Amino acid sequence: MGQYYSIRVWQLKPGQTGADLESLTSSGYLEMQRWIPGVKQIALLRATGARQNRYVLTTTFDSYEAYVYWRQVEEEAPDYWERYAAIIMQWEQFCQLVDEYVGETILETGVGAI
């Protein structure tokens, strides 16, 4: 089994700026993810064009099991991890979840190898 991914599409709430969300992601949110075993990479993409108020947050995990643990932490941590709860509350003030996809890597290769 390959790496596992969580891809979430977030939309800024009216009156919120992308700069605030980007700043929170690069500091507090990233800091919290570093404490969770199995989280390999975080990528935040800003949509352009008609959907420029949307962001795509991709989280890469070592395995499906690491993803399951991350979901458990995400659901339970706000009850006992004050810093995590504060960051999630800020995140949810800035934007709302529009869509979510999860799955494992099927194919990953450089285009020069084709």
Predicted regions and their residues:
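Long, acidic serine/threonine- and proline-rich intrinsically disordered regions
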Residues: 104-108
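An amphipathic, aromatic/His-enriched active-site/gating alpha helix that lines ligand/cofactor pockets
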Residues: 27-41, 60-102, 114
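Conserved "boundary/linchpin" sites in short secondary-structure elements
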Residues: 109-113
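Active-site-flanking beta-strand signature of metal-NTP-handling nucleotidyl enzymes
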Residues: 2-11
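Short, surface-exposed ligand-recognition loops at beta-strand->loop->(often short) alpha-helix junctions
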Residues: 11-25
